[in-house]
């Protein structure tokens, strides 16, 4: 009996959070997008969620600047895929805590639903993985891998601007996850309506759920952070 192998993404974060192995179909026909649940050839994967345990809600300081986003995030974590906040689109300038908040949601999902597969990935890493899958002639494996995620967190989604093929594959992943009741969490430096270089069909989907902004902290919140 073959042991499952581990899929890891480069990270300096040490985490005790683990996903259960997931089954993904392999050796699929090229240039086809099929239902992954009916394709033969299954391999067990261990998926590293890539969540930094320091980025929890416990360590996330709440203030007027982030109250809506945090409340929505906690609602999503309590019932991933089961709220109107799907996707949850968190936006704001760099350094305001988008990564922390998005990972806090993932951490809470894992705490409350250990059986769910959670994955955090930066949009640039997603792009790199997709390019590598094309180079290695296994695009469908890439597609089916992401279609197996229960809660998918894509950080800095605006970095897919101008990357048409990557946007196309993400469009199919988004549709599959949304239609099967899985949770999507996206972060960006701008609200959906202001995104440049992103296909309109994606922007319209980004607006299906809730867009919540993170603002610069007020004095009271800055004091709490200190």
Walk through the language-model features, giving the residues of each.
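Nucleotide-binding/hydrolysis machinery
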Residues: 191-201, 215-226
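Short glycine-rich substrate-engagement loop in P-loop NTPases that contacts/grips substrate
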Residues: 110, 115-151, 164
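Intrinsically disordered, low-complexity basic tails and flexible linkers associated
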Residues: 1-119, 124, 183, 189, ...
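Sensor-1/coupling segment of RecA-like P-loop NTPase cores
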Residues: 172-173, 177-200
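Walker B catalytic acidic pair
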Residues: 155-157, 189
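Short regulatory helix/loop adjacent to the ATP-binding pocket of P-loop NTPases
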Residues: 131-135, 192-208
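Walker B beta-strand of ABC/ABC-like P-loop ATPase nucleotide-binding domains
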Residues: 152-154, 185
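Conserved ATPase-coupling elements of RecA-like P-loop NTPase cores
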Residues: 158-171, 195-198
């Amino acid at each position: 009996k073959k042991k499952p192998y581990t899929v890891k993404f480069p990270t300096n974060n040490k985490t005790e959070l683990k996903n259960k192995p997931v089954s993904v179909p392999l050796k699929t026909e090229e240039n086809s997008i099929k239902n992954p649940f009916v394709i033969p050839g299954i391999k067990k994967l261990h998926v590293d969620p890539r969540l930094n345990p320091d980025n929890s809600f416990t360590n996330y300081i709440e203030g007027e600047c982030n109250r809506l986003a945090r409340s929505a995030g906690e609602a999503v974590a309590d019932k991933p895929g089961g709220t109107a906040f799907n996707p949850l689109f968190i936006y704001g300038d760099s350094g305001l805590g988008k990564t922390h908040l998005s990972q806090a949601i993932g951490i809470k999902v894992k705490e409350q639903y250990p059986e769910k597969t959670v994955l955090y990935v930066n949009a640039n890493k997603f792009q790199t993985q997709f390019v590598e899958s094309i180079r290695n002639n296994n695009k469908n494996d890439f597609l089916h891998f992401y279609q197996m995620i229960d809660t998918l967190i894509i950080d800095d989604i605006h970095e897919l601007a101008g990357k048409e093929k990557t946007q196309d594959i993400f469009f199919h992943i988004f549709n599959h996850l949304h239609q099967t009741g899985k949770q999507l969490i996206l972060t960006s430096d701008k609200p959906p309506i202001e995104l440049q270089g992103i296909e309109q069909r994606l922007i319209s989907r980004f607006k299906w759920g809730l867009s919540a902004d993170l603002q610069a902290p007020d004095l009271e919140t800055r004091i709490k952070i200190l």
